[in-house]
Swiss-Prot record:
Signal peptide positions (record): none
UniProt main location, coarse: cytoplasm
EC assignment: 3.1.26.4
Disulphide bonds in the chain: none
InterPro entries to which the protein is assigned, alphabetical: RNase_HII (IPR022898), RNase_HII/HIII (IPR001352), RNase_HII/HIII_dom (IPR024567), RNaseH-like_sf (IPR012337), RNaseH_sf (IPR036397)
Functional description taken from the UniProt entry: Endonuclease that specifically degrades the RNA of RNA-DNA hybrids.
Gene encoding the protein: rnhB
Listed name of the protein: Ribonuclease HII
Keywords, ordered alphabetically: Cytoplasm, Endonuclease, Hydrolase, Manganese, Metal-binding, Nuclease
Cofactor binding, per record: Manganese or magnesium. Binds 1 divalent metal ion per monomer in the absence of substrate. May bind a second metal ion after substrate binding.
Organism lineage string: Bacteria, Bacillati, Bacillota, Bacilli, Bacillales
C-alpha cells in the first residue's frame, strides 16, 4: 500500500477515534513532517475534547444528584449587570434536558463573544424551558441592586413555561417555596447556571448595543454600561440619562454636585 497524501491523512484522522486504531499506527510510522504535524494537531484536539468532557461531567454533578432523587425540572439561575452604571439587571432561568451536552460550556465571562452567541443559539434550541427577568435602572434605584436582582430572578422563574422542581442559583437565596441550592461561583460549577449566565449575558449585551444606537456618544455597545473612562467622560460631557442608575457612585455624586 502506498503512502497517504497529506490531504488523505487529514481526512483519515477525522474518522479515527483512538490511537489504537490500526490506521493511526500506520500514520505514526510515517516520518514526513506534514504527517507528524497532523498527528500532533489531532492529539491536541483529542486532549481538548477529553478535558471539555471531564469539565462538563464535573459541572453536571448537582443536576445528576438531583435527578437521582427523581427531580427532572431543575432550573439554573444567574444574573448579569449588577455592577454597571447604566442599563437593566438581567437574569435567566434555564431548565435543561438530561441528555443536554455542549462541550466547552462555562461561565459566560470566560467565553468569547462569538462563543457566547453560538452557545446562546444552542441553549435556546435544546433547553426544555427558558425564562428571562429584566429590571430597569429606575426600579434598581428604588429597591437597591440586591433586591432588584432577586426580583429579576423571581421574574425569570415565573416566566418559565414549565414549573421547576428545584432551583440552582448563583450565590443567592430567593424568597420562594421552591426547593433551592445556592452555589458560590455557580456559573462555573453547574451546567444549568452556566447556561443561564450565557442567556442573561447575551440578552443584556444585545439590549446595550441597541442603547448604543440610540445614544452613540456614550459608547454603550463597547462598555455595556460599566464605568469605563470613556463612559464617565461621556456622562461628564453629555449628562446623565434615564438609563443611568442615579443611586450608583459616581453618578450620584455628579448629580449632587450639579444641584
Amino acid at each position: 500500500m502506498g503512502k497517504w497524501t497529506i490531504k488523505e491523512a487529514s481526512e483519515l484522522l477525522q474518522e479515527i477515534g483512538t490511537e489504537e486504531d490500526e490506521r493511526f499506527q500506520i500514520l505514526l510510522k510515517d516520518e514526513r513532517k506534514g504527517i507528524q504535524n497532523l498527528i500532533s494537531k489531532w492529539r491536541k484536539q483529542k486532549k481538548k475534547m477529553q478535558e471539555e468532557k471531564e469539565q462538563f461531567l464535573e459541572m453536571s454533578k448537582y443536576e445528576n444528584a438531583l435527578r437521582k432523587q427523581g427531580i427532572s425540572y431543575i432550573a439554573g439561575i444567574d444574573e448579569v449587570g449588577r455592577g454597571p452604571l447604566a442599563g437593566p439587571v438581567v437574569t435567566a432561568a434555564v431548565i435543561l434536558p438530561e441528555e443536554f451536552y455542549i462541550p466547552g460550556l462555562n461561565d459566560s465571562k470566560k467565553l468569547s463573544e462569538a462563543k457566547r452567541e453560538l452557545f446562546y443559539d444552542e441553549i435556546r434550541e435544546k433547553a426544555i424551558a427558558i425564562g428571562v427577568g429584566i429590571v430597569s435602572p429606575q426600579v434598581i434605584d428604588e429597591m437597591n441592586i440586591y433586591q432588584a436582582t432577586k426580583r429579576a430572578m423571581l421574574d425569570a422563574v415565573a416566566n418559565l413555561s414549565y414549573a421547576p422542581e428545584h432551583l440552582l442559583i448563583d450565590a443567592m437565596k430567593l424568597p420562594t417555596s421552591i426547593p433551592q441550592t445556592s452555589i458560590v461561583k455557580g456559573d462555573a460549577k453547574s451546567i444549568s447556571i452556566s447556561a443561564a449566565s450565557i442567556i442573561a449575558k447575551v440578552t443584556r449585551d444585545r439590549m446595550m448595543k441597541e442603547l448604543g444606537k440610540t445614544y452613540p456618544e456614550y459608547g454603550f455597545e463597547k462598555h455595556m454600561g460599566y464605568g469605563t473612562k470613556q463612559h464617565l467622560e461621556a456622562i461628564e460631557t453629555y449628562g446623565v440619562l434615564e438609563e443611568h442608575r442615579k443611586t450608583f457612585a459616581p453618578i450620584k455624586d455628579m448629580i449632587k454636585n450639579k444641584l
